[in-house]
Amino acid sequence: MSLLILRGDMTLIQFRHGWHRSHRAACCLLLLAVARACADEIPVPAAQQAQPERGVELTEISVQAPEPKFVAPTRRDRIGRIWAPVLIDGKGPYRLVLDTGANHSAVTEHTAQSLGTSTSTDAPARVTGFTGSAMVPTIHASSIDIGAFALGPADLPVLSDVFGGAEGVLSLSDLKNERVFADFAHDRLEIAPSQRERAAKGFAVVPLHMAGGLPMAEILVGGVPTRAIIDTGAQSSVGNLALRKALARQTPRKTSREEIIGVTLEAQSGDSMPSPDIQLGHLTIHGMTVVFGDMYLFQHWNLTREPTLAIGMDLLGSFDVMIIDYARREMQLQLRPREASR
């Protein structure tokens, strides 16, 4: 797939994706997992115009250690998502998909077995994915560590192997004052206390707000104000029917059917079609393909009335560097140098 990106100064940027995109099944890992079968709706802010937020008050959190907590090599799996090496109860490292679109970490059945921890059916978790909901057993993890960065303890839902070869999913929803730095060009992942640094030269800035622990942005799709979920756990970008209806005059009549398989192994179909221009911060993206459908997750979160787009790695992985600064409430994106210089 080839994308064209226009910067704010209208300089043309072009680059290509470096991984295979299946036209038969786009496996989306964005999920909501709540331990002990207690499901909460994500509070959805009122629709806004696609412009930077002003006057946002951020809670100051004391950080004892200003040094980076974790720096390690990272890899993208065969469908383009990021996986990180994680120790669970001191064992591993296990390859977990780094998923900004998940509000709870989870592991596969094989990972649970290798940990030697018996699953609990007395305290099941309800897992809600893009395509459905299911009750699953859990295991208790006393510690979840990425380098020196600790995310545990936690009860982890145990899921079937739908992670494209990875051994689970790593949620970052508990981060409040941290900065996630993913350098795709050099296979580097860093999670560190945020120093509230402004974006460096050459980075585009996308303001974020948090809803249920998920990073969301206000963007424009074909000129239509759209709520965007930043989802590094999804292979493809998926839009709801409200967005498709708003774009009815701009989308082609010819579409192809694509199957979406969620973490519960239930499948739903959507229409895959070229998207109109997407304005993300000061960048304008041409040539995106989006799957539109009445997905279960949009219904669960009451995101059916307002145009909504879950942005996956088909777009996010096309940048050289992606930074999500939870303290500054913003995403910073760096274009590939050879493209930005054109």
Model-derived regions, located:
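Pepsin/retropepsin-fold aspartyl endopeptidases
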Residues: 2-11, 38-342
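Short linear motifs centered on Gly/Pro in flexible linkers and helix caps
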Residues: 5, 16-19, 36-37
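Bacterial N-terminal signal peptides that target proteins for export
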Residues: 12-27
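Bacterial N-terminal signal peptides
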Residues: 25-36
